[in-house]
Amino acid sequence: MIKAIRSAISFLTTLPLGGDVEELRKNLWLFPYAAILIALIVSVPHFIRNFVDIRFLALVLYLGAEGINHVDGLADFGDALFAPKNRKREAIKDLNTGAGGVAVVVVYFLLLYTLLYRSDFWEIALSQVLAKYSMLLLMLLSRPSWDGMGSYFMEKISSKDVFIGAVPVVLLCYKVGIESLAALASGFAVVLLLKAYSEKHFGGVNGDVIGSANCLTFAASLSALTIAGQL
């Protein structure tokens, strides 16, 4: 189990803990749990907000903790989103990032720059856990578009992973309160929309789409919590 935990943290963050991808495939339910560590790192600015520009620091810590793998997937998905209908599949497989991908990533960073400042630790933790949980749901509910990293994990995903992975989601929803319903709704909406769009245009889901689910759910959940908190 220790090896599986190290593998999850190493795969989902930039922390060089080693591990084995094959071991992670057997324990995909660890995704939401590893997200709590990312939330702790990203929340550091809230403890030193009187000394630094925490908006910029929070964004830097987020990228430092999670790395750019999922952001890279978001960029590829952004290229496909803006590509002509007959070239969407080609665009998401292209290794070069185009204007569409850059635009989507810039908007994503701007959202985080604003939202991380307005969110407390529990809201960030819930949003991070939901982001990873959305990856599990998308893998369970979808079919792979082609062979790759996405299909590699989707071969092993099971209802057990989704069930065990739901525990931190439930606990954090209880802690955050009624506003968590807005975050849950936004997360499920992202999963359903990505599934429908990807199966229509790509024939299924690949690693880039799964990575996009992480980014889009994180931003959508933070947005939903911010709006719900002001109502």
UniProtKB/Swiss-Prot annotation:
Pathway the protein contributes to: Cofactor biosynthesis; adenosylcobalamin biosynthesis; adenosylcobalamin from cob(II)yrinate a,c-diamide: step 7/7
Keywords carried by this UniProt record: Cell membrane, Cobalamin biosynthesis, Magnesium, Membrane, Transferase, Transmembrane, Transmembrane helix
UniProt cofactor(s): Mg(2+)
The organism's place on the tree of life at top rank: Archaea
Disulfide bond found in the keyword field: no
Protein family membership: Belongs to the CobS family.
Protein name according to UniProt: Adenosylcobinamide-GDP ribazoletransferase
UniProt organism field: Archaeoglobus fulgidus (strain ATCC 49558 / DSM 4304 / JCM 9628 / NBRC 100126 / VC-16)
Gene that produces this protein: cobS2
